[in-house]
């Protein structure tokens, strides 16, 4: 039986509500004049005090200039939120400050000096490696949530992401070494790149199973007497990089 997304977010147990809330709170908009995308923030165990911004390589590479804005959300005493655009250095003298994963469309920016103000992060232990993913037992057709800014749209103007519902379109427990990406069924669109996919772990806490990096199309070549063109048919699916590779990229950035 279909249940509205709100019912999923406010599911029967407190644990299930918290897993979505915690991952949602650690998802942020990243933008500049040529960029409007999604990122999430993580922390490694102490003594590392840096914050790690995780997003796609293509978004950072396509950005212009040396700075981007990270849209933080400052809680106010009256229960409202204030938008706080924090300037992030993405290049120094034209050289990227982020670390790219050697194999995938995945980038991590190490913020040695964390942003000012109040903001949420997730511990890297919330990212699924193979062991954590197996313990959670997701299956083909089971649900996951995705938090993004589709076409740059904010659910609330102070920088809140949009919660989207998806299902695993292929078995998620296949070897992530052999199959480093997986597909999920949802109406993927521009701005979803960089969004974390999340399920509940066995303790009801957030488990980041991967990061969305592209929407899936079927390309059809159409040839006429005069021209040949490619028609892209949207398949309403997105492709995710498995969580273990997010962990790899964060560790690479930590060694900078």
Language-model features: where?
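Positively charged n-region of N-terminal signal peptides that target proteins for export
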Residues: 1-4, 162
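Sec-dependent N-terminal signal peptides
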Residues: 4-13
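Catalytic histidine site
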Residues: 19-83, 112-114, 134-136, 167-176, ...
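Hydrophobic alpha-helical segments and helix pairs
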Residues: 81-125
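Gly/Ser-enriched beta-turn/beta-hairpin loop segments
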Residues: 114-118, 156-162, 171-180
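Short glycine/Trp-rich loop-beta-loop segment that forms part of the substrate-binding cleft
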Residues: 126-157
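Catalytic nucleophile loop of clan PA
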Residues: 185-212
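C-terminal cap/linker of serine protease catalytic domains
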Residues: 207-256
């Amino acid at each position: 039986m279909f249940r509205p997304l709100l019912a999923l977010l406010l599911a029967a147990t407190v644990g299930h509500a918290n897993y979505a809330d915690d991952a949602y709170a650690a998802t942020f908009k990243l933008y500049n004049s040529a960029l409007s995308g999604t990122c999430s923030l993580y922390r490694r165990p102490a003594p590392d005090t840096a914050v790690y911004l995780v997003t796609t390589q293509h978004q950072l590479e396509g950005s212009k200039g040396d700075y981007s804005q990270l849209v933080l959300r400052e809680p106010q005493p009256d229960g409202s939120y204030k938008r706080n655009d924090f300037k992030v250095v993405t290049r120094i003298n034209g050289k990227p400050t982020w670390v790219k994963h050697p194999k995938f469309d995945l980038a991590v920016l190490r913020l040695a000096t964390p942003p000012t103000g109040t903001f949420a992060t997730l511990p890297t232990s919330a990212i699924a490696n193979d062991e954590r993913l197996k313990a959670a037992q997701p299956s083909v057709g089971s649900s996951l949530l995705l938090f993004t800014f589709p076409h740059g749209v904010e659910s609330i103007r102070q920088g809140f992401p949009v919660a989207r519902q998806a299902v695993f379109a292929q078995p998620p427990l296949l070897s992530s070494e052999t199959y480093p990406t997986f597909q999920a069924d949802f109406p993927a669109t521009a701005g979803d790149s960089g969004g974390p996919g999340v399920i509940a772990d066995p303790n009801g806490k957030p488990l980041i199973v991967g990061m969305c990096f592209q929407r899936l199309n079927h390309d059809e070549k159409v040839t006429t007497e005069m021209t040949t063109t490619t028609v892209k048919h949207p398949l309403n699916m997105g492709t995710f990089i498995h969580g273990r590779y997010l962990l790899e990229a964060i560790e690479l950035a930590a060694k900078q």
